[in-house]
């Protein structure tokens, strides 16, 4: 029946009001057909299987993992009899494919086999869209990779966008955060006159639009972010600027950031990230054991070591800190996450409690700063001029006044 749906297909090209002569369509799937995604996935899987046949086992990336025991007990991965290894060479989504390998030679072999299999099945690799990214090990010098398809040398880049997220050669999210801020700022600016300055819309409606359009753009893919304090400052600064524009709060009004969040009835970016990352971790823990995200979370690369001294933070480190902040036991969190509804309720309560604690901390910090400023101020102390006897409130004022007195020739 599927074959009959695709037999004797013909098409035409329409340009303005003119149509070309009809021509037969002998390959491909129907555009807009509900079967097209499934059929292409099956076709692509068979092609990929053909491409990977005969490859050496060392031309791949291995992950050593162990699903029992505590996630944060890394010593459990040192057991040789209780750990498993998972091999993967490709990361697929629809018609996008990412090939991964540890060495340049292995990646060249993978790329050549993939291109040959694609040509065998009537597909063509887009050379303009295909790029090579090299992520060197810590303290290893960056070397420009040389990967070819046929006689064409593929472009080597330090960053590229895959599924909407920016991946860089230094394995940091600095550029991703910058891109998210730029896209969110663009989305916010396009609605400036239409929504934010529209006097006919209620404040609640504007906040709902801000949540649906701007925040979703800003926090796209943030479930797996490994953030540092400077990233959080950039995100919170943008969040506050947008809310102050929506609420029409000027800097001369002297409204604190906590009061802005309370007026908008919206949490901080830090609380949002805490909530989304805990929910994402619970979703991974409920996955089947053969799923790659779960294997990556509960395992580590079989090849290579982390840098000594101050290594880069991992998602596990962020997760452990978030669990501690929410007062959730590190050893029992996966058991709690097994029940989806219960875990969502726990995370929601924990995020709300964290936000209240954060606000109280900021209020107390501001109160202490005001007290220090009040105690440091000495309005009753004066500095008297030895020439004319005038009292100045500050030492620098006295110096300036004495200079003027000396020009007038007053005696000491």
Language model features by range: what are they?
Residues 4-412:
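Short linear motifs embedded in intrinsically disordered, charge-biased segments
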């Amino acid at each position: 029946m599927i074959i009959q749906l695709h037999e004797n297909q013909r098409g035409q090209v329409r340009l303005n009001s003119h149509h070309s002569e009809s021509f037969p369509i002998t390959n491909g799937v129907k555009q807009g057909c509900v079967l097209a995604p499934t059929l292409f996935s099956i076709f692509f899987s068979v092609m990929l299987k053909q491409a990977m046949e005969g490859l050496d086992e060392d031309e791949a990336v291995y992950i050593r993992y162990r699903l029992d025991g505590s996630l944060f007990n890394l010593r459990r991965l040192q057991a040789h009899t209780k750990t498993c290894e998972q091999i993967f060479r490709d990361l697929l989504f629809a018609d996008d494919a990412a090939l991964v390998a540890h060495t340049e030679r292995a990646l060249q072999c993978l790329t050549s086999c993939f291109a040959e299999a694609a040509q065998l099945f009537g597909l063509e690799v887009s050379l303009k869209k295909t790029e090579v990214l090299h992520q060197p090990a810590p303290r290893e010098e960056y070397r420009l990779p040389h990967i070819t398809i046929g006689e064409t040398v593929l472009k080597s880049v330090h960053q590229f966008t895959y599924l909407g997220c920016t991946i860089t050669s230094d394995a940091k999210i600095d550029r991703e955060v910058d891109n998210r801020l730029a896209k969110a700022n663009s989305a916010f600016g396009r609605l400036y006159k239409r929504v934010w300055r529209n006097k006919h819309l209620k404040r609640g409606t504007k906040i709902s639009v801000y949540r649906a359009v701007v925040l979703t753009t800003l926090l796209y893919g943030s479930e797996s972010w490994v953030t540092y304090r400077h990233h959080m400052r950039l995100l919170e600064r943008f969040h506050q600027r947008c809310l102050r524009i929506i609420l029409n709060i000027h800097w001369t009004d002297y409204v604190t950031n906590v009061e802005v969040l309370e007026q908008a009835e919206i949490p901080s970016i830090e609380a949002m990230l805490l909530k989304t990352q805990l929910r994402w971790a619970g979703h991974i823990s409920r996955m089947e054991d053969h799923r790659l995200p779960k294997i990556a979370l509960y395992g580590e690369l079989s090849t290579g070591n982390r840098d000594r001294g101050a290594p880069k933070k991992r998602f596990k480190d962020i997760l452990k800190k978030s669990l501690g902040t929410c007062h959730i036991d590190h050893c029992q969190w996966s058991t709690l996450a097994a029940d989806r509804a219960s875990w969502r309720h726990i995370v929601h309560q924990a995020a709300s409690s964290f936000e209240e604690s954060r606000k109280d901390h900021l209020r107390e910090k501001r109160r202490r700063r005001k007290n220090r400023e009040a105690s440091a101020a000495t309005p009753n102390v004066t500095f008297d001029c030895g020439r004319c006897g005038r009292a100045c409130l500050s030492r620098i004022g006295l110096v300036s006044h004495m200079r003027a007195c000396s020009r007038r020739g007053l005696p000491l």
